[in-house]
């Protein structure tokens, strides 16, 4: 039998409205704590990530127990494809605050196969080190109430939950990037690298 992998995030070529419906349906089917991908409306600073996920409010109560376990970064550079960097974080806000530096260090060490890839990696690392608004998604574990509350945050575009029997460590995870409007497809890569 073929090997199958759980996925979180849109498929290449998928219509964005179809993915948004699929993500909403996944949260509606959750009946206990679940792992979920949170994709943002725009690239956020880590401070905005913490605000959008750590003190989630529902009518009449504060929801605790939302745990960010991975922060995903992609530095926006017009008409330049930049790499997606995913940084695992322990369960505390300070680790989330330090995660752009970890992503920057990884980018510099990875470099690239071509001069352009190396230039993109260095430009991305520089912006991450400077605290850019570059977080495009997070992987969280939360209760159904927590996931529903996160869905209503103004910075959140989509929340997609994994099935309860799936492992986030074995799943392919790719956020819905802010620039995906109609269809999930790569943009141009012909712009100058700063």
Where are these regions (language model features)?
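Inhibitory N-terminal propeptides of secreted protease zymogens
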Residues: 1-153, 157-194
């Amino acid at each position: 039998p073929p090997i199958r992998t759980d996925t979180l995030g849109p498929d290449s070529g998928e219509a964005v409205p179809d993915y948004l419906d699929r993500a909403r349906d996944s949260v509606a089917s959750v009946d206990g704590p679940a792992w979920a991908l949170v994709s943002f409306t725009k690239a956020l600073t880590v401070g905005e990530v913490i605000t959008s996920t750590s003190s989630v409010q529902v009518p009449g109560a504060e929801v605790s127990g939302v745990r960010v376990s991975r922060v995903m970064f992609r530095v926006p550079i017009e008409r330049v494809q930049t790499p997606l960097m995913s940084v695992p974080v322990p369960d505390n806000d300070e680790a989330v605050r330090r995660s752009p530096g970890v992503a920057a260090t990884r980018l510099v060490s990875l470099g690239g196969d071509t001069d352009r890839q190396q230039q993109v990696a260095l430009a991305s690392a520089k912006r991450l080190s400077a605290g850019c608004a570059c977080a495009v998604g997070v992987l969280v574990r939360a209760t159904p109430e927590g996931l529903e509350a996160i869905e209503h945050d103004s910075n959140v575009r989509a929340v997609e939950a994994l099935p309860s029997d799936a492992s986030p460590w074995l799943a392919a995870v790719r956020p819905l990037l802010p620039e995906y409007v109609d269809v999930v497809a790569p943009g141009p890569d012909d712009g100058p690298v700063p």
